[in-house]
Swiss-Prot record:
This is G-protein coupled receptor 15. Its main location: membrane. The keyword Phosphoprotein applies. It is found in: Cell membrane. It comes from Chlorocebus aethiops.
Length: 360
């Protein structure tokens, strides 16, 4: 395989490639120059406002802070940093792929997108593990689920994400084609393709498997508790519903784009390409907006499904309602689940020990 003929998209944005065939494909997609600027402006406005309110509400909320809130604040900060770059891509789409803001912002904005993607996936994975420990292993996890541990984990995630984004700075460049500037990906060598494949597997698909595994274990534990109690516990049923909504939102946001990226890398490593570059480029171009929209929907998901965050946001926006209670209980759904399942697990352990002692 000739390295000079290898040109697939490797970054987390479907920017116009120097490859003329891909550039032609990009220009033939009718909605990009009209729909995407409008869509990204809406994502920018709602996302910046939503994440700012979410960070402010949780940071300045009086009283003790939940452990999960530390991860949520960092996730909102990651989304906010990415959203700041969206106006640059709005200008790019409106100008039919031309990059008019210089080489520094070409590299810098692509780097921030890569850091955001890695940071978001790792934070969501940690949040899933934290929820798994809180609900499935409430007693054993007490020594791990501490505030200082959460801060160390978040700092490590930021450091690792910044390191993983560094290849983007080297692979992105401002390219002149017919005297027109394009922020594009350099032609990929086989070695770079292999590195991209390994990085994609370990920074997306492995965390994705961890997230799905954690939530499946949580759902199974909740179902076992529901069957054991024999009661129609609305909070437990709602919690199971929320779990699948969170997983579904993550899958819809990132799986199509990263699957297209995976196929593009595998196709580039093969002697004979089974997937035409135009089809792969179109797949990433269509699925890219779904991935980026995830940065603006998270605050709304938390507001709708987390009563604790809903109260914090309302109190932040309307201090006059500070003493007004927006629910019958001040505890979060996780608190209810932790207490209920802790009792359930203790009962299970007691039953096992009793059966074991009887059998002996």
């Amino acid at each position: 395989m000739d390295p000079e003929e290898t040109s697939v998209y490797l970054d987390y944005y479907y920017a116009t490639s120097p490859n003329p065939d891909i550039r032609e494909t990009h220009s033939h997609v009718p909605y990009t120059s009209v729909f995407l600027p409008v869509f990204y402006i809406a994502v920018f406005l709602t996302g910046v406002l939503g994440n700012l309110v979410l960070m402010g509400a949780l940071h300045f909320k009086p009283g003790s802070r939940r452990l999960i809130d530390i991860f949520i604040i960092n996730l909102a900060a990651s989304d906010f940093i990415f959203l700041v770059t969206l106006p640059l891509w709005v200008d790019k789409e409106a100008s039919l792929g031309l990059w008019r803001t210089g080489s520094f912002l070409c590299k810098g904005s692509s780097y921030m997108i890569s850091v955001n993607m890695h940071c978001s996936v790792f934070l969501l994975t940690c949040m899933s593990v934290d929820r798994y420990l809180a609900i499935v292993c409430p007693v054993v996890s007490r020594k791990f689920r501490r505030t200082d541990c959460a801060y160390v984990v978040c700092a490590s995630i930021w450091f690792i994400s910044c390191l993983l984004g560094l290849p983007t700075l080297l692979s992105r460049e401002l390219t002149l084609i017919d005297d027109k500037p394009y922020c594009a990906e350099k032609k990929a060598t086989p070695l770079k393709l292999i590195w991209s494949l390994v990085a994609l597997i370990f920074t997306f698909f492995v965390p994705l498997l961890s997230i799905v595994t954690c939530y499946c274990r949580i759902a199974r534990k909740l179902c076992a508790h529901y069957q054991q109690s024999g009661k129609h516990n609305k909070k437990l049923k709602k919690s199971i519903k929320i779990i699948f909504i969170v997983v579904a939102a993550f899958l819809v946001s990132w799986l199509p784009f990263n699957t297209s990226k995976l196929l593009a890398i595998v196709s580039g490593l093969q002697q004979e390409r089974y997937f035409p570059s135009a089809i792969l480029q179109l797949g990433m171009e269509v699925s890219g907006p779904l991935a980026f929209a995830n940065s603006c929907v998270n605050p709304f998901i938390y507001y709708i499904f987390d009563s604790y965050i809903r109260r914090a946001i309302v109190h932040c926006l309307c201090p006059c309602l500070k003493n007004y209670d927006f629910g019958s209980s001040t505890e979060t759904s996780d608190s209810h689940l932790t207490k209920a399942l802790s009792t359930f697990i203790h009962a299970e352990d007691f039953t096992r020990r009793r059966k074991r002692s009887v059998s002996l």
